[in-house]
Regions:
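Secretory/periplasmic and organellar redox-cofactor proteins
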Residues: 1-39, 46-141
Length: 141
């Protein structure tokens, strides 16, 4: 499949997903006023740099930046997967990292557009990782 997509397209796609995800969480937090839980903060720590790093790599046509995209996306995906496990109840609540005074990692506020935010995050990180790999493997146009 990587022969069907160019380095430019793959890197641009990864950057668009990272940028859209970053803007979406800012919208959820700043416009909708929903405070992020602890796990959301950690996912943001992986997503925000992706928008910058992949954007600069695209601007400078540095396709090697895809390796940083893969690393950051896999780190964020691991946290999103853990978050999704807590949200769905697969992981026991006793290992829940959220504090008693802050927002919950598992309540109904963790839904956006009818889908759990941890699932949306996992999908975004997965797409970024796949597209970043394609940007490393694909032919240049």
């Amino acid at each position: 499949m990587s022969s069907m997509i160019s380095k430019d397209t793959a890197l641009a796609g990864a950057w668009i997903v990272a940028l859209a995800s970053s803007l979406a969480v800012l919208y959820i937090g700043e416009v909708l006023g929903q405070a992020p839980c602890n796990l959301c903060w950690f996912q943001r720590a992986f997503m925000f740099p992706l928008a910058v790093v992949l954007g600069l790599g695209l601007w400078w046509q540095d396709y090697g930046v895809g390796r940083y995209g893969v690393a950051l996306a896999l780190g964020g995906a691991a946290i999103a997967l853990w978050h999704l496990g807590l949200y769905t109840g697969i992981l026991p609540e006793r290992i829940q990292p959220c504090t008693a005074t802050g927002p919950s990692c598992t309540d109904d506020n963790q839904v956006f557009l009818g889908l759990p935010i941890p699932l949306l995050s996992l999908i975004a990180f997965g797409l970024i990782a796949i597209l970043s790999i394609f940007s490393l493997k694909a032919q240049r146009t």
